[in-house]
Amino acid sequence: MLTLKIFVYTCVIFFSSLFIFGFLSNDPSRNPNRKDLE
């Protein structure tokens, strides 16, 4: 049961960080050099 809980928390943190880093890297205000988003 403890192993399952640790596995679930790891997946949640992994996908959350993946979403956050992907959102930050795709944010035009943080990366003004990328003009292909417009």
Curated annotation (Swiss-Prot):
InterPro entries: PSII_PsbI, PSII_PsbI_sf. One of its GO terms (biological process) is photosynthesis. The keyword Transmembrane applies. Keywords: Chloroplast, Membrane, Photosynthesis, Photosystem II, Plastid, Reaction center, Thylakoid, Transmembrane, Transmembrane helix. The keyword tRNA processing does not apply. The chain crosses the membrane at residues 4-24. It holds the Pfam family PsbI. It is a single-pass membrane protein. HAMAP family: PSII_PsbI. PSII is composed of 1 copy each of membrane proteins PsbA, PsbB, PsbC, PsbD, PsbE, PsbF, PsbH, PsbI, PsbJ, PsbK, PsbL, PsbM, PsbT, PsbX, PsbY, PsbZ, Psb30/Ycf12, at least 3 peripheral proteins of the oxygen-evolving complex and a large number of cofactors. It forms dimeric complexes. Belongs to the PsbI family. One of the components of the core complex of photosystem II (PSII), required for its stability and/or assembly. PSII is a light-driven water:plastoquinone oxidoreductase that uses light energy to abstract electrons from H(2)O, generating O(2) and a proton gradient subsequently used for ATP formation. It consists of a core antenna complex that captures photons, and an electron transfer chain that converts photonic excitation into a charge separation. This is Photosystem II reaction center protein I. It comes from Cyanidioschyzon merolae (strain NIES-3377 / 10D).
